[in-house]
Design a protein with these regions (language model features):
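Acidic, metal/ion-coordinating pockets
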Residues: 8-333
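Bacterial N-terminal signal peptides that target proteins for export
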Residues: 1-4
């Protein structure tokens, strides 16, 4: 009798245990055009590429999160730097990523194979962080990172829905975004001990704020899964809306974090981005996204600093008008 009562006490205590809360920061494209790399070279005294100053203005938002996720769109490859249309980015970008406070990065994009499998390999080697979306082997492709955050175990899964038509070295080199594949990988992560998954998708139509029909369809299907808690996305190079789909947050497009895109070549909004700050609660292995705050960002020229957009500025108003406001969603103060 005493043992039974003790067991019940343990069970009730676990049920009554307060939930833990944590914040995940997710940001937009690192799109390292030639002029951005040239600024990093200047910041490095002309001897090395130092990208750290570009991100110092937003460091508190990245380092201040419990988990920070970045999106490396272009391959990190030693040797001559190349910009658009076939990128080769200095590997020292990875040093800036780590110094700014990002904890893991997605690497699946339409530029993942700009330098072939070699570029995939050198990117992963340079990052020295958990990554998802590209792989050096079939085994690596099957093992998405599971990240520990305040006792919760979060799988990070990344995929691209778009490519530039490059030859694919191996079936496992880049993770392609199909609903069945994504759901399979999310379930596999659950079997490996993950409580839930955050899915990063490189998707949508370039320079369009509108959510495409294919984005809507994929978001609806994925958010029906109990194995997925939230979706974040990039590729459009402009901000896209943040919505609740099946009661889960979907950040359809975070815009560019850093690039050389301006109104001179592209929409003025290509200088805009956002850092999504998703607040989760975890209790007894159940993880749920409760609310989203976001930091509108802007790429300042000519020094390419990524700065929080001034409240009420043209950039801030553009981003807020697209990203949206709701009881669970608002720009951060």
């Amino acid at each position: 009798m005493t043992a039974a009562l003790a067991a019940l006490g343990v069970m009730w205590a676990s049920q009554l245990a307060p939930p833990t809360s944590f914040t995940v920061a997710a940001s937009g494209d690192f799109l390292i055009h030639g002029p951005v790399a040239a600024q990093a070279l200047s910041d490095g005294g002309g001897r090395r590429y130092d990208f750290r100053p570009l991100f110092r203005p937003i460091r508190r938002h990245i380092a201040g999160a419990d988990l920070a996720l970045c999106h490396v769109e272009t391959p990190l490859v030693p040797g001559p730097v190349q910009g658009y249309p076939s990128f080769r980015t200095p590997p020292s970008l990875a040093q800036a990523i780590r110094a700014t406070g990002w904890d893991a990065c997605s690497t699946a994009s339409n530029h993942s194979l700009d330098a072939g499998q070699h570029g995939v390999n050198t990117t992963i080697r340079a990052l020295r962080l958990p990554h998802s979306g590209t792989a050096r082997s079939a085994r690596g492709a099957r093992r998405a990172p599971i990240l520990r955050v305040k006792g919760a175990r979060i799988a990070f899964l990344a995929f691209t829905a778009v490519s530039n038509g490059q030859a694919v070295p191996h079936p496992w080199s880049v993770a392609w975004a199909g609903a069945r594949r994504i759901l399979r990988d999310a379930r596999r992560a659950r079997r490996r001990g993950a409580d839930t998954a955050i899915v990063n998708l490189h998707w949508g139509d370039e320079y369009s704020h509108a959510i495409s029909p294919s984005q809507w369809a994929l978001a609806r299907r994925l958010t029906r899964s109990p194995a997925i808690a939230a979706i974040v996305g990039q590729h459009a190079h402009v901000v896209q809306p943040i919505r609740r789909v099946n009661d889960k947050p979907v950040v359809f497009g975070e815009g560019n974090l850093v690039s050389n895109q301006t109104a001179g070549c592209c929409p003025a909004a290509s200088q805009d981005g956002l850092i999504a700050l998703i607040r989760f609660t975890a209790r007894n292995g159940r993880v749920r996204a409760r609310r989203v705050r976001y930091v509108p960002t802007w790429v300042r020229h000519p020094d390419y600093r990524v700065v929080p957009a001034a409240r009420g500025s043209v950039s801030w108003r553009r981003t807020v008008a697209v990203a949206g406001r709701a009881a669970w969603l608002r720009p951060a103060r």
